[in-house]
Amino acid sequence: EGRLDMRMNPSAALSAWDVINTYSKEQLMEVFYKYGEINNARNLSAAIVTSRASNPINTTNELSDIARPFSGIKGMKYLAQVFQALRIEVNDEIKAIEEFLEQTPEVLSFGGRLVIMSYHSLEDRPVKNFVKFGVIKGQPEKDLYGNFFCPWKLITKKPIEATSTETEENPRSRSAKLRIAEKI
């Protein structure tokens, strides 16, 4: 049991406690749906808002106790998704990945390689689009003939994933994807 925090930078203003205890039901629902890919985000958000009306939600155990009835057959995986959503919101992780990717063409020399490991689909999606199309969101650039222009040559057509041996030794590696692209 720990205090709801989840900040990677302890001096950052926003903590998980702030999100859980100050966000509106709609804001919580968006966080859980967008970053946790939780289908019943509306019900979970309503339960959090109802619970905090009497007392603030201070610890991870308190939040787990509120979320557990909504987990269904997913159990611990559901709780992991709830806390993943909070962590991503608190640390603005997707924005950090996107900002990093946008800077890479300027700092990487021609022939330089971009190697990125992602651990879940929300991280992998912008990486995949960037190395495949040269953009994170929106339409990729096209040349005069309608061909896609991308400043990257894929070194790995598909992401490199952990082998069964690796996942046995290191269970956390099961979701890791490694993508490699070369600046052209």
Which residues does each PLM region occupy?
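S-adenosyl-L-methionine-dependent methyltransferase catalytic core, i.e., the SAM/SAH-binding region
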Residues: 1-184
